[in-house]
Amino acid sequence: ARDMTKQALPAVSEVTKDTLEEFKTADKVVLVAYFAADDKASNETFTSVANGLRDNFLFGATNDAALAKAEGVKQPGLVCTSPSTTARTSSPRPSMRTYPRLRKVASTPLIGEVGPETYAGYMAAGIPLAYIFAETPEEREEFAKELKPLALKHKGEINFATIDAKSFGQHAGNLNLKVGTWPAFAIQRTEKNEKFPTNQEAKITEKEIGKFVDDFLAGKIDPSIKSEPIPESNDGPVTVVVAHNYKDVVIDNDKDVLVEFYAPWCGHCKALAPKYEELGQLYASDELSKLVTIAKVDATLNDVPDEIQGFLPSSLFPLARRMPQSTTLVPHCRGSRPVHRRERLTQASASVGEAVEDATESAKASASSATDSAASAVSEGTETVKSGASVASDSASSAASEATKSVKSAASEVTNSASSAASEASASASSVKDEL
């Protein structure tokens, strides 16, 4: 019945100073536009959005400049309200992008609760998330009340949420907080996976947290970075990466980089380790090590820019001019089209190793053939010596020449095979880049 009533109303209802307050509470999410009557573009955009979303939200509009001023809105402006909060924006010309952003802000609780059902939504919100860790519902309610003025002040800039420290306390470690020391507060810049933990000895009060949040927004606080020491040497087939050299090794270099993000306790990671070392050996030659780096990072001890969704993912970071964005590969996931393409990218990278392995086997066979040929020639030369010194000299010279040609041919095959392997892998990666 409620939906039928909404359908009976116009897509955009006209509001006045007498009806505005009641209209604001008429639905879960209400958008009111304050546009001048002659602002044709803004009015048309608002009406178009309203026609498409009238089943989900309530839309109202007024051309009354005095009412806009009384509401503290500068024309052209939009105000989005819900039972828990109000969000507003003023701009020279609100665009279609304005509306989803306002609806998302207005529909997010002022201080919500982080849990399995809400975590993904907070991560996708596009703004930082402030965590309030506390053990009991009573404590979480108390801190929510204490920090409510800050949540109101920074609505649309930072999401505030409590989190059950008993059930999800281990997540504090991901934010570089000390697990077990409660209550605790930290901000996560979700888009960059940067962490800003507070001093856990300080009290969680509006004053203390307010200053921390203001400094965070002003860029006065550096993110907390957890890192192992940079290795003194990295001579093995697999380069060890830590947080403090991640940018230099993985991002700012002139090579393609394949990175394994692992956890020492992960059984799958342990099973992969010897194979990954073999892969590193395949790329250890002078020819290929100039093009590709095989690397690994302990994701439990090092912060990295990308959030790791479980362990054992590998990420290929191609040279920027070939593919400017990193691609995360999760081998144990199946079914989605993006993952399928990512697996193809992994295969394109792995084809280098396979081709090099083929080239190596070919080289061994060619070298063996060359050795046999040389031995046979020397044997024939020896027999010839027995029959005549002059003929022996010519035969030995001819044998040495043939052996040299055979070895050169084998070396040429190795070089061509490796070059072809690198060329095919580069072309394959380029093809996948075009699809992505």
From Swiss-Prot:
Family to which this protein belongs? Belongs to the protein disulfide isomerase family.
Q: Where is this region: Disordered?
A: 328-436
Q: Which GO terms describe its molecular function?
A: protein disulfide isomerase activity
Query: What function does this protein fulfil?
Result: Participates in the folding of proteins containing disulfide bonds, may be involved in glycosylation, prolyl hydroxylation and triglyceride transfer.
Where does this protein reside within or beyond the cell?
Endoplasmic reticulum lumen
Record-annotated disulphide pairs = 266-269
* Swiss-Prot/TrEMBL keywords: Allergen, Disulfide bond, Endoplasmic reticulum, Isomerase, Redox-active center
- Phylogenetic placement of the source organism: Eukaryota, Fungi, Dikarya, Ascomycota, Pezizomycotina
* GO terms (BP aspect): protein folding; response to endoplasmic reticulum stress
Q: Which GO terms describe its cellular component?
A: endoplasmic reticulum lumen
Q: Where is this site: Contributes to redox potential value?
A: 267-268
Active-site positions on this chain:
266, 269
The answer to keyword Isomerase applying to this record is: yes
For this chain the motif Prevents secretion from ER maps to 433-436
> What superkingdom does the record give?
Eukaryota
What are its E.C. numbers? 5.3.4.1
Query: What is the official name of this protein in its record?
Result: Protein disulfide-isomerase
Q: Which Gene3D superfamilies does its entry note?
A: Apolipoprotein, Glutaredoxin
